[in-house]
Amino acid sequence: MESKSDASVATTPIISSSSSPPPSLSPRVVLSPCAACKILRRRCAERCVLAPYFPPTDPAKFTIAHRVFGASNIIKFLQELPESQRTDAVNSMVYEAEARIRDPVYGCAGAIYHLQRQVSELQAQLAKAQVEMVNMQFQRSNLLELIYNMDQQQKQEQDNMSFESNDLGFLEDKSNTNSSMLWWDPLWTC
């Protein structure tokens, strides 16, 4: 048989001397709903499909996409995609929606056309610059060849001109290596 003292000992909690507080319940974190749920005025579920892509700090992002595509179409589209592609899809939808709002007729296609036209104009400018560069290189090579030819011609003229004046004002032949035969030496000695 059990005594009353044994039963009371078993139900009383043992308090340790380390004085640690009993585990308390963590305070419930209240997160603000995503921008999509705020705009749609609905409760944001824990597994909201739109929450990772439309943060509460950027409501304009969802507003723009919602105006053009509608919330149900955005949700359906995201549910059909794998999670790895959803971020790019949302960014693309927002870009397309912004383009459609700016240009209701052409939308994104108008921006693409404008960019393609810029690319073709820049390619034409690049081709023109490359042609000018080739012409300048050709002119440079012609100029260098002309300078080289002129330099060679001057050297030949200096080599051809074999007479220079000496200190006495007479001309002597520098090309002749035999220094004993000068032109003023008499041919006949008496």
Curated annotation (Swiss-Prot):
Pfam families with a match to the protein in the record: LOB
Region (Disordered): 1-27
Tissue and organ distribution: Expressed in young shoots, roots, stems, leaves and flowers.
Residue ranges of every copy of the LOB domain listed in the record: 32-133
This protein's GO CC annotations: mitochondrion
InterPro entries xref list: LOB
Start-end of Polar residues biased regions: 1-11
Assigned protein family: Belongs to the LOB domain-containing protein family.
Entry protein name: LOB domain-containing protein 1
Species the sequence originates in: Arabidopsis thaliana
